[in-house]
Amino acid sequence: MLVLGLLVAGAADGCELVPRHLRGRRATGSAATAASSPAAAAGDSPALMTDPCMSLSPPCFTEEDRFSLEALQTIHKQMDDDKDGGIEVEESDEFIREDMKYKDATNKHSHLHREDKHITIEDLWKRWKTSEVHNWTLEDTLQWLIEFVELPQYEKNFRDNNVKGTTLPRIAVHEPSFMISQLKISDRSHRQKLQLKALDVVLFGPLTRPPHNWMKDFILTVSIVIGVGGCWFAYTQNKTSKEHVAKMMKDLESLQTAEQSLMDLQERLEKAQEENRNVAVEKQNLERKMMDEINYAKEEACRLRELREGAECELSRRQYAEQELEQVRMALKKAEKEFELRSSWSVPDALQKWLQLTHEVEVQYYNIKRQNAEMQLAIAKDEAEKIKKKRSTVFGTLHVAHSSSLDEVDHKILEAKKALSELTTCLRERLFRWQQIEKICGFQIAHNSGLPSLTSSLYSDHSWVVMPRVSIPPYPIAGGVDDLDEDTPPIVSQFPGTMAKPPGSLARSSSLCRSRRSIVPSSPQPQRAQLAPHAPHPSHPRHPHHPQHTPHSLPSPDPDILSVSSCPALYRNEEEEEAIYFSAEKQWEVPDTASECDSLNSSIGRKQSPPLSLEIYQTLSPRKISRDEVSLEDSSRGDSPVTVDVSWGSPDCVGLTETKSMIFSPASKVYNGILEKSCSMNQLSSGIPVPKPRHTSCSSAGNDSKPVQEAPSVARISSIPHDLCHNGEKSKKPSKIKSLFKKKSK
């Protein structure tokens, strides 16, 4: 009875007199009391009529409905702040935002109130009874727990306690006894989460998932693909840039190695030049010693000759003649040995200066190529340093990867490397070629007096002027060799001083002074006029004067070469030049098959040069040369700056060959003054024999050591007239020695 009275009193006060943790016991006790004493309950029926569960519509008959009603009353009290029995719009909005922690409560608020602005407990109960959540089964509740609450670990506890939709209001009010003791949820955060989710479905109905947005999925997929593709592209570009940079660094290292090898090669070049200078000094010392010996032999011969001339007795004169003859024989043997050591013919001294000038011009072109290669190297280094600086910044790697600067720098490095390689190959080939030329010729080419001195000495007597371009280093010949061959007139016709030469010297130098081509064709009459001084008839051994040609200006296609100020107006064609050349050569050929000079003439004539064997036998001439002939020969030799020196057989040299002429091996070739260049360094022969050192000209040494008064007497002994060559008089060695002996004895 006491418990029943308490229930009635609690119902009058809104069922809040009994604590929540005792409500289960009260319900259980009231049910037991009602079952045990139905008579008492029947006696108190007016009191039960005031129970709110029975007064509600629809009424609550079961225990679960009672628990649900109590939970709804608790929720209504929490939302009703002013305790007026109704939930206004402001109160529900504040509860949704603060207690349920919803930021956007518009949809929830409209779903809760609908058209009713004042919600009472009866309205809340009716909505709960008609709600879909109220009719949830155990499976629906478990699905809600797993999918929406996301607490699948409590599925077993819900299943054991048979939690259905009608039990959710008890979870929404957070009964500790029910949540902890029955559902066994010990985690506070899980209890709070479960309470908020249960309160949501009790007040606002079941949660509905929004429709699946395929556009978002597509956009997300495309974004993922783009992101992955961008990452892959960035990775590949970074890898490619690193490979490019590594390759560039490797090329730069190889470039530095090539530069170092070039420096080493230049050091070797300097050492080789120093060795060449030392060899030249030693060579000069040997030549000086040989000249001393020759001068001593000449003095001894002169002394014996003076003794022979001053002797009165025939016997003493014969003895002196025999001694002199012995000296001549010794000198002749020595000359023959030297002639055997030398090649078949000698080259004039002017070729040495022309080769030295060619070497200096080639060195200047090499220096220009070297400067260009060094400039390319500096540019490549600067670009590589810029790339390094760019890669050190934050966005430098991406900038370098997406730009074409790496390819450009790589191309510049390869170009600089190629230029250095070509420069090194050119330097090696040039060094080897000029060393071989020096070995074959037997004189210095790389070590010379310099380009200004060579230019002034070789172009001092010329009437045409060469003006180089500004961009090219100063050198006398602005065009190539082919340009000079085609544009310049024949050298013989340009200089009138060469026409006053004796026929012997003319014939000897005609093959060297002949031009390869003619520029302007001429008529037969001027050609015959030009043939006369170059190919003299045997009946006219000397021509004192020559036809004069009117100088005219010759236009040149090369802007670097100025017009010729004085040159003949008409030039010979190739046929007439060949006729002059062969007519001049035939004067040197003597039809004597038994002599040694015949074989030499046949081999030397094929090489387009005068026979050198006549130099040896010029000393054995039975005829004396007068002072007028010697002076005429010297004057003609001084007037011609381009022809070969005629003093091959010096009066004081006793048949020695001229020491300033070049020595060529049989394998060497000379094509009209142009040095043939080898196509490949591998084809160059490294076994070319080194010629003997040259000797200074005997005639020059004799002129320095002897007074001027002794020249006629010496010439009478050792010189041969040019008429011997023109008339074809030639004999063997024994006959010449005997005739010399007879003449001298007289």
Curated annotation (Swiss-Prot):
It is a single-pass type I membrane protein. Expressed in all tissues and tumor cell lines examined. The keyword rRNA-binding does not apply. SUPFAM superfamilies: SAM/Pointed domain (SSF47769). Residues 136-204 form the SAM domain. Changing D80A: No effect on inhibitory activity. GO terms for molecular function: calcium channel regulator activity; calcium ion binding; store-operated calcium channel activity. Residues 537-549, 733-746 have a biased composition (Basic residues). This is Stromal interaction molecule 2. It comes from Homo sapiens.
